[in-house]
């Protein structure tokens, strides 16, 4: 969240944003499940201009052995941005942001998984950001959840994800990169729609209590929209688009 001055009109007098969307409109979301042959499960997502690939391995033996948990399986997650994912070449080594997002996604996914059915094993989630455009952690979380379902990992529900934020003193859905850099607040949310449970909520910026409530409600509404795309991706994968 930058809060920087910008010459771009983020929100015009008709309530239209800089990319032509309305206040409560998400960017285009497309998800394809089962795109990798060598992973146990996989998914590819385009969320606006974000392009992200998620691959799953496991349940499998845990290495190193000291990480084994006798009563349950463990989830490990690596979120990585390719050097060409942003306009200025990114160094290949993991950044503090990548390490933080890896941890955030892991903790957002864990409540959805029945890891207790696979004690002494690990499920590994690998996320590769091919192109980033604001909201990549939400896009990555949504793709990872579809990939876990594609891998056949028992789940209580899928985790959907979307962000809302404050731009030009207005609460808007699904903040893009330009809005993120110049906006006032950004709130990514992870949500399990069938269970009506939030698994992730973060806030970068400052909101009043009323703005916070409206922002969270709008983000959850966005999650529900993304959830429909997630379900369609799995339906297309296993039933050829049938119900």
Swiss-Prot record:
SUPFAM superfamilies: Ribonuclease PH domain 2-like (SSF55666), Ribosomal protein S5 domain 2-like (SSF54211). It is an enzyme of class 3 (hydrolase). Disulfide bonds: none annotated. It comes from the Archaea. GO terms for biological process: gene expression; rRNA catabolic process. It is found in: Cytoplasm. Its main location: cytoplasm. InterPro entries: ExoRNase_PH_dom1, ExoRNase_PH_dom2, ExoRNase_PH_dom2_sf, PNPase/RNase_PH_dom_sf, Ribosomal_Su5_D2-typ_SF, RNase_PH, Rrp41. Keywords: Cytoplasm, Exonuclease, Exosome, Hydrolase, Nuclease. The keyword Nuclease applies. One of its GO terms (molecular function) is 3'-5'-RNA exonuclease activity. One of its GO terms (cellular component) is cytoplasmic exosome (RNase complex). Pfam families: RNase_PH, RNase_PH_C. Its EC number is 3.1.13.-. NCBIfam families: ECX1. Belongs to the RNase PH family. Rrp41 subfamily. Catalytic component of the exosome, which is a complex involved in RNA degradation. Has 3'->5' exoribonuclease activity. Can also synthesize heteromeric RNA-tails. Component of the archaeal exosome complex. Forms a hexameric ring-like arrangement composed of 3 Rrp41-Rrp42 heterodimers. The hexameric ring associates with a trimer of Rrp4 and/or Csl4 subunits. This is Exosome complex component Rrp41.
